[in-house]
Amino acid sequence: MDQAIAKADTLIEAMGWIRRFRGKTTVIKLGGSLLEDREALQHLLLDVIFMETVGLRPVVVHGGGKAITEAMAKAGIEAQFIRGRRVTDEKSLEVVEQVLAGELNVELTEMMERFGGRAVNLSPRTTCVLKGKKLIDPEGDDLGFVGEVTEVDRDVIESLAYTDQVAVIPSLCTDDKGQLYNVNADTAAMAVAQSLGADKLVFLSDVNGVRRDPEDPATIIPALSAEEARQLIADGVIKSGMIPKVEACLETLGRGVQKVHIIDGRLRHSLLLEIFTTDGVGTEIHQ
């Protein structure tokens, strides 16, 4: 009986948050590393289905870095990176498109359908909602077919949300001539969140959030203002690999998104715990 009462208490706690976020858009960036963890992925997709069921409007944007690298290796193509961006020649682009649009995007959609949700894969093979152009590297390096998103077809995405369906979008864009480009998944998610006027953008990571001590998960900072985050970077508290994540969060806030979250996607039901509980499980960055 005590366990049943505890479950009821949890539902009551969630009720206030459900009312608050009902009808609001949350963009969820799903990274390549989590796509390899089948158990974690299953719980994350169940979380997304729950969010849609109780009236939120989740949108999933995904990459697939590890799977792409493995597929390129099988094809005899050596992966090359310049400042974190994958150099994408014509042969590499074929592999990227096959993995993102032909495999992962379809698989994620089918998994959500099997779990009882309604999802639609929006890729260049079906309906491409990300328009863009070739990314010009500021250092002058030619990254090949690497692009940046300049326009999002929000009408298509919102029409799905209004009919209780979840859009699942790979990090690929096309230009006005139909040329395909590989896009960084973080920046693709940011563009989608900005275009939709999302209330939240959630980066699913392999760390539990911003920590005062990078080696100690117990030092997680539950909430930060944009100003506090900039100060922690200046003070050296936020450093190394966490800096680009936090800078991406700050850029997203600057584009009008209300809140950005960094959470550990490997934690069971981390999405629900972050959004529907008072304390959350990651770091929330806000203006």
UniProtKB/Swiss-Prot annotation:
It catalyses: N-acetyl-L-glutamate + ATP = N-acetyl-L-glutamyl 5-phosphate + ADP. The keyword Amino-acid biosynthesis applies. Pathway: Amino-acid biosynthesis; L-arginine biosynthesis; N(2)-acetyl-L-ornithine from L-glutamate: step 2/4. One of its GO terms (cellular component) is cytoplasm. It is found in: Cytoplasm. Keywords: Amino-acid biosynthesis, Arginine biosynthesis, ATP-binding, Cytoplasm, Kinase, Nucleotide-binding, Transferase. The keyword Signal does not apply. One of its GO terms (biological process) is arginine biosynthetic process via ornithine. Substrate binds at G64, G65, R86, N182. Gene3D superfamilies: Acetylglutamate kinase-like (3.40.1160.10). GO terms for molecular function: acetylglutamate kinase activity; ATP binding. Its EC number is 2.7.2.8. InterPro entries: AceGlu_kinase-like_sf, AcgluKinase_fam, ArgB, Asp/Glu/Uridylate_kinase, Glu/AcGlu_kinase, NAGK-C. The record marks K29, K245 as: Transition state stabilizer. Catalyzes the ATP-dependent phosphorylation of N-acetyl-L-glutamate. Belongs to the acetylglutamate kinase family. ArgB subfamily. This is Acetylglutamate kinase.
